[in-house]
Amino acid sequence: MPKHYCDYCDVFLTHDSASVRKAHNSGRNHLANVRDYYASLGHDKAQSIIDQITSAFESGQGPPPGGFGFGPQHLQAPPQGGFAPPMGGFPPGGFPPGPRPPFPPGPGFPPMMPPGAPPFPPNAMPPPGAFGGPPPFPPNGPPGAPPFPPNASQQGGPPGAPSFPPPPGGFNGPPPPSGQNSQGPPPPTNPGPGGMHPDRARMMGPGGR
């Protein structure tokens, strides 16, 4: 697995994984190095960097091909050996200026539709190629019809009945322990003076009312 190089600390991390980078970036030495770097830039340079990032964000474009021109990588030569291109096939400096290419549809997502088109044709199936497997919902039926087809495994059950048999004994809860009735909670055992619970009376001490 390729190693990740931290420009601020001038070190290679053990692996290039999100958890390792997150742990490194929250470390005391890394934060001190970042703070020292930006403090050495001066107010005008830092403000110009902020303006570049803000204008790129507002225009909806990615960073310029060479980056924004800040960070330690622009002050010194890269380490020997170079780096492999980032995983996923994206260009090293981000997307080029201009409109970004659409991402290819993954499995389970419909292809790009023309602007203003409804997501699915009314009372019909989704367009061909929209889903790789069976449709998640059946086509729209007449108004007032149930959203799902009746279950074929039900033998004469009423509409809306569950598609599985109820458990033995129905849906009632567990039976109460022997010696208790099923009507409400059990009465308190030997209430204390004035109807107070014995634990509370004990906590309050003698004559604690």
UniProtKB/Swiss-Prot annotation:
Main localization of the protein described in the UniProt heading: nucleus
Compositional bias segments (type: Low complexity): 72-87
GO CC annotations, alphabetized: commitment complex; U1 snRNP; U2-type prespliceosome
GO MF annotations in UniProt: mRNA binding; pre-mRNA 5'-splice site binding; U1 snRNA binding; zinc ion binding
Protein name: U1 small nuclear ribonucleoprotein C
InterPro entries reported for this sequence: Matrin/U1-C_Znf_C2H2 (IPR000690), Matrin/U1-like-C_Znf_C2H2 (IPR003604), U1-CZ_Znf_C2H2 (IPR013085), U1_snRNP-C (IPR017340), Znf_C2H2_sf (IPR036236)
Localization, UniProt: Nucleus
Function noted in UniProt: Component of the spliceosomal U1 snRNP, which is essential for recognition of the pre-mRNA 5' splice-site and the subsequent assembly of the spliceosome. U1-C is directly involved in initial 5' splice-site recognition for both constitutive and regulated alternative splicing. The interaction with the 5' splice-site seems to precede base-pairing between the pre-mRNA and the U1 snRNA. Stimulates commitment or early (E) complex formation by stabilizing the base pairing of the 5' end of the U1 snRNA and the 5' splice-site region.
Entry similarity comment: Belongs to the U1 small nuclear ribonucleoprotein C family.
Region (Disordered): 72-209
Domain of life: Eukaryota
Disulfide bridge positions per record: none
Biased composition range(s): Pro residues: 93-150, 159-191
Subunit-level organization: U1 snRNP is composed of the 7 core Sm proteins B/B', D1, D2, D3, E, F and G that assemble in a heptameric protein ring on the Sm site of the small nuclear RNA to form the core snRNP, and at least 3 U1 snRNP-specific proteins U1-70K, U1-A and U1-C. U1-C interacts with U1 snRNA and the 5' splice-site region of the pre-mRNA.
GO biological process, one term: mRNA 5'-splice site recognition
ZnF bounds (Matrin-type): 4-36
Keyword Transferase attributed: no
Keyword annotations: Metal-binding, Nucleus, Ribonucleoprotein, RNA-binding, Zinc, Zinc-finger
SMART domains hit by this protein: ZnF_U1
Pfam families the record matches: zf-U1
HAMAP family attached to this UniProt entry: U1_C
